[in-house]
Amino acid sequence: MSDDQIDLYIKQGIYGTFETKPEERNVYLGTLRERIYVALTIGQVRQNKIYSEVLASLETRKNQTLFLNGTIDYGALSKYIKAANKEKIPFTIVSDQNDTKIGLIVASDHAIDHKDIYVRDKIFEQTFK
């Protein structure tokens, strides 16, 4: 091993593995903006209805994961978990994120760069005013 490799090994042992764009990952439930198909706010996830944009994404796209904000009660998350299970899409409940307004994300396993990831309605506008 070279000195640089030993240095890197020691730093990773002390500080953990390096993470790209940690601020962005804190906002987007552990994933990157460039991978997101659809994002809902916490308020949108708490609504009784299931957003059709999320269902459409789950039904038509493969190689994706549903990320859910763990601060939201399970009753509000369960409808999205059932939809993901129906389409055999894996889901993750993220409970170690920092303060974020994001409640749900449907993300790819690679960069897709969707221009507008948010479902813009009254609840979204109230959240980000």
Regions found by a protein language model. Give the residues of each.
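Extended, non-globular alpha-helical segments
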Residues: 39-60
